[in-house]
Regions:
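Outer-membrane beta-barrel porins/channels
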Residues: 1-220
Length: 220
């Protein structure tokens, strides 16, 4: 087909809060919480007509965690995150109630969807699932993770991600480890799927190498 350009813009809005270290009976601890609203912006426009616009993949993430600071050398971190797409669900109702959705009705439904503004769409995404509130909950993905950290230099990690089978069925565990020396950090992780649906990243081993310039680290 003919090449065409598209235009839009997007912003992210995020916040993070972490408490000071709190003393408990047998350990110290630290709470944290955060949010991230991603890709907020006008619909992607491929020309100047309303029918050639698409919603950006706006997304909301809410997370929290707690650090078990066992002593000067050992720390365990637990984290939980929920995520939801902030895009309205396309609707295709039977407008005249005769039991049949005609081409004219479908065109009207599509036009009604195209007329939804991006701000309206963000709010509408919380209440427009055809199956009601129970289906809205199915649109939420859940992630949980744990990390053991020794001397802020060596870490072991594990995590789990869950997406409802009706909404994509991505479900997988991950295992990982990390090592930091001076300004160099090496991380490795392995992902394996627990879903019947194939994941392109399942059974993959991933490495990352990070150089941190400007910060000072203790060397062990």
């Amino acid at each position: 087909g003919d090449a065409s350009s598209a235009s839009s813009f997007a912003v992210d809005v995020a916040g993070f809060f972490q408490t000071e270290e709190i003393s408990y009976n047998d350990f110290n601890g630290r709470w944290r919480a955060g949010f991230n609203l991603q890709n907020l912006g006008p619909k992607m426009s491929y020309d100047n007509t309303q029918s050639s616009t698409n919603f950006l993949p706006s997304n909301m993430k809410l997370g929290g965690g707690f650090d078990f600071i066992l002593d000067d050398y050992n720390k365990v971190a637990l984290n939980l995150e929920v995520s939801k797409l902030l895009v309205p669900t396309p609707q295709d109702p039977d407008l005249n109630g005769d039991g049949t959705i005609t081409t004219a009705e479908r065109n009207e439904n599509n036009q009604n969807y195209d007329n939804i503004g991006w701000v309206e769409g963000v709010f509408q995404s919380f209440s427009d699932a055809p199956g009601g509130f129970s289906e809205e909950l199915k649109e939420v993905t859940y992630s949980a993770g744990a990390e053991y950290l020794y001397q802020d230099s060596f870490s072991l990690r594990m995590g789990y991600f869950h997406e409802n089978p009706d909404k994509g069925a991505r479900q997988f565990f991950s295992l990982g480890a990390g090592f930091r020396y001076s300004a160099i950090k090496v991380d490795v992780s392995y992902l394996f799927s627990t879903s019947k649906v194939k994941n392109p990243l399942e059974n993959t081993l991933r490495f990352s190498l990070t150089f941190n310039f400007g910060d000072q680290y203790d060397e062990y």
